[in-house]
Regions:
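Calmodulin-binding IQ motif helices
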Residues: 377
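A conserved structural/catalytic subdomain of Rossmann-like adenosyl-cofactor enzymes
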Residues: 1-374
């Protein structure tokens, strides 16, 4: 902190225990809080660092701050498994960044905690004291299990959907005199045909009206000049703006989908800008690894587009031919199943008579001998 500029920011990765252990660590926490240095504490998932499974935090420190509160973020639930470790996804990181930048209170995720509250807790900064990110306990209704019906509290738990689709709840359920509900027949048809659902779908389509043209303008028309390093953020902001006012859709799930595609898109754009527009038409050998003489060897197996995959070209310019090939492949697969069934239905005596056209295991036909036999029929 001493070496920071007045407006400087320092982040430290620490084990979770520094937030609540006593002794000198408790004294350090007290001094940091009283001198208004702790801007945010971000709890990370366990097991995200190789070699250790202990939970960790990121502590954000500032030398000078205008506010005296501290943002507590519990990001321990946002991760995916990656081998033996956990891994933060791009969407998880973006959620953390946005919450910290906005210093936002988000239920079960983050909370601004006053210095007075921290004092009352004797400078204990253990994250669960301030943010409860635990799942709601699962409950079982014995009456419903024995006599049927849906408890009202289970339907109430879906309140975000009833708020997004007004009137749908009443159309889906009949409430019995005992207070339990019965779902009406064909709920999928009720949902898909309900006015509030149709309105939601229309609002969603309207929000993304022109999105394709926006992408074409940014990524196709300007592919040779677009600033690749800035473009993902521009696309993200556009998507977030379009999703404003659209309930139920997790904007960070949408960002994750964009980011996963952007990894490929950005590489393509950089290649076009480096090699020129004609690289879009270039093809390269498609190399695969095959066993040869007991060793793995890389060999060419056809060709592939350097930028545009062949399957996109085929589906766009030759849809009828692609459909015909798919139908032939389906027929071939069906014929193979029928041949297998035919072999399975043969008796041992039949297999002896057909030994010239069956393999050594008598479980499949040999193509060449079988074709020769058919010629003589």
């Amino acid at each position: 902190l001493y070496h920071l500029k007045p407006d400087g920011i320092m982040t430290i990765v620490l084990p979770h225990g520094v937030l609540f252990r006593g002794g000198e660590e408790g004294t350090i926490r007290r001094n940091l809080i009283e001198n208004n240095h702790i801007d945010a504490i971000i709890g990370l998932p366990p097991n995200i660092f190789f070699g250790t499974g202990i939970p960790t935090i990121i502590m954000v420190l500032k030398q000078k701050r205008d506010s005296t509160d501290t943002l507590i973020v519990d990001a321990s639930k946002g991760f995916v498994k990656s081998g033996k470790n956990n891994m933060l996804r791009a969407g998880d990181i973006r959620r953390i960044v946005d919450v910290v930048a906005a210093r936002a209170d988000v239920e079960k995720y983050s909370r601004l905690v006053s210095r007075d509250e921290i004092r009352e807790n004797d400078y204990n900064l253990n994250i669960p004291r301030y943010v409860d990110s635990s799942e709601d306990p699962e409950t079982w209704d014995i009456y419903a299990s024995m006599f049927g019906g849906i408890p009202a509290n289970e339907i109430d738990a879906l309140s975000p959907y009833w708020e997004a689709f007004p009137g749908l709840r009443g159309e889906l359920f009949d409430v019995q005199p005992n207070g339990y509900a019965q779902c009406k027949d064909d709920p999928a048809a009720i949902v898909n045909g309900h006015a509030s659902v149709l309105e939601f779908e229309e609002n969603y389509r309207r929000a993304f009206d022109g999105f394709g043209d926006f992408l074409h303008e940014h990524l196709v028309s300007r592919c040779e000049t677009v600033k690749v390093s800035r473009e993902e953020n521009l696309l993200t902001q556009d998507i977030f703006t379009r999703l404003d006012g659209i309930p139920l859709v997790d904007r960070y799930a949408a960002f994750q989908m964009l980011h996963e595609q952007w990894t490929t898109v950005s590489l393509d754009l950089e290649m076009i800008q480096r090699e020129g527009f004609d690289t879009i038409r270039a093809i390269d050998p498609h190399m695969v690894v095959k066993k040869k003489n007991g060793k793995d060897q890389e060999v060419q197996e056809g060709w592939e587009g350097r930028i545009i995959p062949f399957d996109i070209v085929q589906k766009t310019l030759m849809p009828e031919q692609v459909k015909a090939v798919a139908e032939l492949e389906e027929r071939l697969e069906q014929a193979q199943f029928e041949l297998t069934d035919l072999v399975d239905s043969l008796s041992e005596e039949d297999k002896m008579e057909l030994s010239d056209v069956l393999n050594d295991d008598n479980d499949a036909f040999l193509a060449t001998p079988l074709n020769l036999s058919l010629i003589h029929i």
